[in-house]
Design a protein with these regions (language model features):
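Divalent metal-coordination and catalytic microenvironments
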Residues: 7, 61, 108
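Alpha/beta-hydrolase-fold serine-hydrolase catalytic core, especially in secreted/extracellular enzymes
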Residues: 67-68, 75-142
């Protein structure tokens, strides 16, 4: 759409939402973020294939180590979901939430400044994060 400068998707059901054409028609930078422990929308199955269809050189796929589908949800430790354990809620949801905010900011700042969006293995808020561009993601198979 006109006036749209970037898109950020988090734990996206890529195969369900985007269909066969995926994100191919989006001509702005996209930051797609998934968690390495996400059992609901596993990054390789749900984010990689749609990401590989993107054409913009500043699009990025970020995988947050220890992040789950629920890591992004702000919850108190005494809530029932948090008692399910790290297999479902991730290693440390608060750190992952900080990392998500920082990933958003880094991505948008790079676009605002007219530079290239960050890529590579990064420590974001103390969390290891793998940020891939199209070239890095190309040889990967879901």
């Amino acid at each position: 759409p006109e006036g749209l400068d970037a898109v950020i998707v988090l734990n996206s059901f890529g195969s369900l939402l985007w269909g066969e054409q995926g994100l191919a028609s989006i001509d702005v930078p996209v930051l797609s973020i998934g968690g390495s422990m996400d059992l609901i929308t596993p990054p390789l199955n749900e984010q990689l294939r749609p990401f590989q269809q993107l054409q913009h050189p500043n699009s990025r796929l970020a995988v947050v180590e220890g992040g789950s589908h629920f890591s992004a949800v702000g919850m108190r430790r005494d809530q029932a979901l948090m008692r399910l354990g790290s297999d479902l809620v991730g290693e440390d949801p608060r750190l992952v939430q900080q990392a998500l905010v920082e990933l958003h900011v880094r991505f948008l700042d790079s676009l605002y400044e007219g530079g290239s969006a960050p890529r590579g293995i990064q420590s974001v808020a103390g969390v290891r994060t793998y940020v891939l561009d199209g070239e890095m993601a190309e040889p990967l198979q879901p």
